[in-house]
């Protein structure tokens, strides 16, 4: 296992940006159609290609999963706490999961958030 090593020429590219969003706009967190639209726009901003989007209303919250050609984007919401989790993962060297993540943060109206980045690339 190589920890903390950046690969110069990975054969498999994997970039993941994920985090927790706090003090979000409660109305947006409840709105399935709006969340789907936000994911579509985020994918465009991150230069990703959406294959399919599925959503589920769970109580007041919503889970939205977008399968992108390059991997996935997810948003899970808890409006009663004004809280959401977001995960943007891409295997495309031409993509920007960070730009997509930042767009989602902005559109959910998060007053504060955590952000984590993982390089999941491999040289094989």
Swiss-Prot record:
Q: Which domain of life is it from?
A: Archaea
Instruction: Tell me yes or no: is Ion transport among this UniProt entry's keywords.
Output: no
Q: What is its EC number?
A: 4.1.1.50
Q: Which GO terms describe its molecular function?
A: adenosylmethionine decarboxylase activity
Quote the cofactor binding remark: Binds 1 pyruvoyl group covalently per subunit.
Q: Could you say which cofactors this protein requires?
A: pyruvate
Keyword match Lyase: yes
Pathway where it operates: Amine and polyamine biosynthesis; S-adenosylmethioninamine biosynthesis; S-adenosylmethioninamine from S-adenosyl-L-methionine: step 1/1
| Keywords linked to the UniProt accession | Autocatalytic cleavage, Decarboxylase, Lyase, Polyamine biosynthesis, Pyruvate, S-adenosyl-L-methionine, Schiff base, Spermidine biosynthesis, Zymogen
Thermal behaviour (record text)? Optimum temperature is 75 degrees Celsius. Thermostable. Retains 20% activity after incubation at 100 degrees Celsius for 1 hour, 80% after 16 hours at 70 degrees Celsius, while no loss of activity is observed after 16 hours at 50 degrees Celsius.
How does this chain assemble? Heterotetramer of two alpha and two beta chains arranged as a dimer of alpha/beta heterodimers.
Q: What is this protein called?
A: S-adenosylmethionine decarboxylase proenzyme
Gene name, per UniProt, is: speH
């Amino acid at each position: 296992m190589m920890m903390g090593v950046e690969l110069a020429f990975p054969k498999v590219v994997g970039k993941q940006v994920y985090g927790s969003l706090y003090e979000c706009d409660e109305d947006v967190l409840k709105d399935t159609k709006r969340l789907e639209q936000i994911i579509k726009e985020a994918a465009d901003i991150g230069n990703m290609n959406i294959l399919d989007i599925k959503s589920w209303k769970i109580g007041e919250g919503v889970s939205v999963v977008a399968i992108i050609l390059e991997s996935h984007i997810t948003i899970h919401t808890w409006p009663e706490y004004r809280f959401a989790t977001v995960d943007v993962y891409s295997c495309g060297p031409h993509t920007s999961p960070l730009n997509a993540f930042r767009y989602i943060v902005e559109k959910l109206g998060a007053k504060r958030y955590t952000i984590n980045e993982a390089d999941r690339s491999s040289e094989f």
